[in-house]
Amino acid sequence: MPESLLPLDRLMTTLRTRAAERPEGSYTTKLMNGGAEAIGRKIREEAEELIEAADEPDEAGRQHAIYEAGDLIYHAMVLMAWRGIELDEVAAELARREGTSGLVEKASRPAKKDSGTADS
C-alpha cells in the first residue's frame, strides 16, 4: 500500500474496532447505532458541503474542498465499517472497472427499481 494511503488503512482499523466494540461516547458509535439512515444523512450532508466548497475560488476554496473531502471519505468509511465492507473490497471493485467506460459499466448493471427520481 502506498504510504500516502496508510492513514485510510489506519482509520479503517479504528472504524472496525468501533463497529465491534461500540464504545460509549464515541461519535462513530453514535452514527453506527443510528444505522444506514443516520450514516447516510451525514454522507449526504458532507457531499453537499464538498460540492459547495469545490465552487469556492482560489487556494482557500481548494483547501476547504480538501477538508470537506476528508469528511465525506470518513463518513463513507463509517458506512463501510458498519456494513462490514473492507477497503480492499472497494479497491478490487475499482480495479474491476478500470479501463471500462463509465457509460458501459453503468449499462451493464441490473436495472434498479424506480425511485421516483430522474437520472438515478
UniProtKB/Swiss-Prot annotation:
It is found in: Cytoplasm. The keyword Cytoplasm applies. The keyword Cytoplasm applies. It is an enzyme of class 3 (hydrolase). It catalyses: 1-(5-phospho-beta-D-ribosyl)-ATP + H2O = 1-(5-phospho-beta-D-ribosyl)-5'-AMP + diphosphate + H(+). GO terms for biological process: L-histidine biosynthetic process. Keywords: Amino-acid biosynthesis, ATP-binding, Cytoplasm, Histidine biosynthesis, Hydrolase, Nucleotide-binding. Residues 97-120 are annotated as: Disordered. GO terms for molecular function: ATP binding; phosphoribosyl-ATP diphosphatase activity. It holds the Pfam family PRA-PH. Residues 106-120 have a biased composition (Basic and acidic residues). Belongs to the PRA-PH family. This is Phosphoribosyl-ATP pyrophosphatase. It comes from Rhodopirellula baltica (strain DSM 10527 / NCIMB 13988 / SH1).
